[in-house]
Amino acid sequence: MHRRLVAGCRISTCLLIGLLALAATGAAATEPTEQLKASIDRVLAVLEDPKLKPAPTAPERSAAVRKIADDIFDFDEIAQRSLARHWRMLTDEQRQEFVHLFSDLLERSYMSKIELYSGEPIQYTGERVDGDLATVTTRIITKNGTEVPIDYRMLKHGAGWLVFDVIIEGVSLVANYRAQFNTIIQTASYGELIKKIQARLEELRTPR
């Protein structure tokens, strides 16, 4: 049951590759695609830093990558959209708890796999901007030559853009979690959902 809190293998594998294109630059205002293109070097610099390659530095390396994720992902928006109508029934304290747990789940589920990236090319194929909303379309070329389309849905925040959904081969990360969370809440309770997320986090924190 705990595994149902994590997206499928195809989603997780492609997402961790796509995350390399999502390191915020913290620079002046840029168009969404320009921000994605310019930001890849920040993550690659962490992965290629010789000081962070030895096994004992793995926690430091992971923390550096997670910090970059915090800069580009709108975890509040992702959490709210993933809970959908159930979000409205939560107190402010419950919302804060959920955002904290869910963002930790996302980061640990995907960031821990980031080092599996081995140079797969990322092609930027288009951009649609509608006010404060944008979609950047890309595709990943896998080692066997398969093209995997990945779309990034983004919200404008100040001078930059934050990602609130990733759509891989037509499957939305947010919609995937929304369906899982809704099933658990409907068949059990919101409290049970929190317990399952906490249990999954314990699994991810346990060294293997």
Question: What are the language-model segments listed below?
Answer:
Residues 10-23:
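Bacterial N-terminal signal peptides
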